[in-house]
Amino acid sequence: MAIDKTTLAILACPKCKGKLTYYADKDELVCRGERLAYPIDENIPVLIADKARELSSEELEKVPS
């Protein structure tokens, strides 16, 4: 599922309120500042910090800017 640009522009990381990037390869929303990836479940972003997974430096490098 792709997130449209308008929706992505209004979403923010619940932890730091920073910008999120859509990572199509994993179908996740990524916060670079917190190094967290939020899942998308049945086309709904799950923006709950406890549900996010931490990204390694290697994974973070693969996420498009």
From Swiss-Prot:
InterPro entries: Trm112-like (IPR005651). Transmembrane segments: none annotated. It comes from the Bacteria. GO terms for cellular component: cytosol. Belongs to the UPF0434 family. This is UPF0434 protein IL1511. It comes from Idiomarina loihiensis (strain ATCC BAA-735 / DSM 15497 / L2-TR).
